[in-house]
């Protein structure tokens, strides 16, 4: 998930994966949607994420080819989910590899103009991340097989991600139960690509879309501090949010938008000139991070 002010194709991978799974009949019986939703009270188990080793490998610079193969061999740690997310992103990278960035400089309201050299360097880094992956590796049929195999071998993250594809058709209680489990995983990629997408809720009293946090509803149109804090949350959970490895930052730079060095720098730029806003956003982020780390994820409901 990215703040509403910035639309990135890289964080749409989970949605595409969910649609693919539904299309090939991979949404299975026996998911939490088929059982009575538990009323989660109190804290989740605050433990080290099962994917901790995968996160470290995912963050390493350079090609992710070997990572994909390693991840597919470890579905018990969420590896199938990680692998299919990489394949989805790299499919887009290779599809646009022949398109060079615009030669002229561009700028957004939160950044200095982006030079063509910066854009080309970011595009090169993206291609390096996908080096060694063939067109066959990235074919729909291969990704569908990886999803099916991951479900057969009980990848917990993939099962939750696919179940989230039905969130729009669930009761609010079941949707909250799923959100609780996703956040309680403590995994930065699962939270970024899936949990934060379904965390956007509708206030039943007003019909306004926004986020619940610490018992207060924050409308998207009125409070960007919450969305910016959520944008930083995966960073604190272990994701490399520098332009060396962050798909979102790299893609925006490659496409001629801002070339922020990190998500933290981007947030600071967005809030520049608004007294106290940056400090408030960072304080919210720290409380969110502490809640996930301690298992107190009910504060997001």
Language model region names:
Residues 2-15:
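N-terminal Sec-pathway targeting helices
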Residues 12-26, 83:
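Hydrophobic membrane-insertion alpha-helices, especially the h-region
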Residues 29-48:
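Ser/Thr/Pro/Gly-rich low-complexity linker/stalk segments immediately outside membranes or between
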Residues 49-58, 160-164:
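Alpha-helical segment of the N-proximal tetratricopeptide repeat
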Residues 52-60, 96-99, 103:
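Long, acidic/serine-threonine-rich intrinsically disordered regions with weak helical/coil propensity
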Residues 59-68, 173-175, 212-217, 223:
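Short linear interaction motifs
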Residues 72-80, 87-90, 94, 101, ...:
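Short helix-capping/linker turns of helical repeat alpha-solenoids
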Residues 242-243, 247-301:
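Terminal, low-structured helical/coil segments at or just beyond the last alpha-helical repeat
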């Amino acid at each position: 998930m990215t703040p509403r002010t910035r639309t990135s194709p890289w964080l749409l991978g989970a949605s595409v994966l969910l649609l693919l799974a539904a299309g090939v009949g991979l949404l299975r019986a026996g998911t939490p949607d088929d059982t009575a939703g538990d009323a989660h009270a109190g804290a989740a188990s605050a433990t080290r994420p099962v994917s901790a080793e995968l996160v470290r490998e995912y963050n390493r610079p350079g090609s992710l080819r070997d990572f994909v193969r390693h991840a597919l061999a470890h579905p018990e740690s969420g590896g199938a989910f990680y692998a299919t997310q990489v394949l989805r992103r790299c499919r887009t990278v290779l599809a646009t590899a022949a398109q060079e960035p615009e030669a002229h400089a561009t700028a957004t309201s939160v950044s200095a103009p982006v030079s063509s050299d910066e854009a080309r360097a970011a595009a090169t880094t993206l291609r390096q991340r996908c080096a060694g992956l063939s067109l066959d590796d990235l074919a729909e049929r291969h990704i569908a097989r990886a999803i099916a195999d991951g479900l057969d071998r009980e990848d917990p993250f993939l099962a939750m991600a696919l179940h989230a594809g039905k969130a729009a058709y669930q009761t609010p209680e079941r949707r909250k139960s799923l959100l609780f489990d996703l956040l309680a995983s403590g995994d930065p990629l699962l939270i970024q690509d899936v949990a934060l997408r379904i965390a956007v809720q509708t206030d039943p009293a007003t019909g306004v879309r926004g986020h619940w946090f610490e018992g207060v509803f924050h409308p998207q149109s009125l409070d960007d501090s919450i969305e910016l804090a959520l944008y930083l949350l995966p960073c604190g959970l272990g994701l490399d949010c520098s332009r060396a490895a962050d798909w979102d930052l790299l893609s925006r730079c490659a496409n001629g938008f801002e070339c922020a060095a990190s998500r933290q720098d981007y947030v600071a730029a967005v809030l520049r000139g608004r007294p106290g806003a940056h400090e408030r956003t960072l304080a919210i982020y720290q409380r969110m991070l502490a809640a996930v780390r301690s298992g107190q994820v009910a504060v997001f409901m």
